[in-house]
Amino acid sequence: VEQVDSIIYKSCSSDSELQQILSLQQKNLPSALTEEEKSKEGFVTVVHTFEILKKMNKACPHIIAMANDKVIAYALSMHPKFGNQIEVLVPMFNEIEKLELTDFIAMGQICIDKQFRRKGVFRQLYQTMKTIVFPEFSSIVTEVDAENKRSLAAHQAIGFTDLTGYWSGSTFWKIIQLK
């Protein structure tokens, strides 16, 4: 548990926190945003069920940021064993397999409540994740829709580097890594 500017960063540890993650996710899906918001603010793509979110959390806890006892940001930890349980992520895990990467944890999704953006929360979520999952894992791997310029820039700014990219339907995905 780390506290920075009255925001607490920690592992997700309750059903209530999981529910709050899902509620923040719903607010940031493309269907909930205008075109301008999507290009300026970014968006999340995958919708998780409570059950899968809970299973993922048990295998490797999600990282959350809390302010006033509310989840205001999250980074989902996804153990590679879940690679085939979320259909839309299967292609990413197939691509990672080709690279023969070992001992990595996938970051399944990151999201920050709109009023807490541009305050260093993104960087601190990943910092907390590294503290918790290293040395068990030696890198964090994720994918970003190449159209999601805001997310790509934010990941590059904290040290993510390109591994590979692939097309899935009409979307080009960049697979990136943080060591």
Regions found by a protein language model. Give the residues of each.
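A short helix-loop-beta-strand connector motif used in the catalytic cores of GNAT acetyltransferases and
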Residues: F50-I64, P80-Q85, A106
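Conserved acyl-donor/pantetheine-binding loop and adjacent beta-alpha core of acyl/acetyltransferases
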Residues: L76-Q109
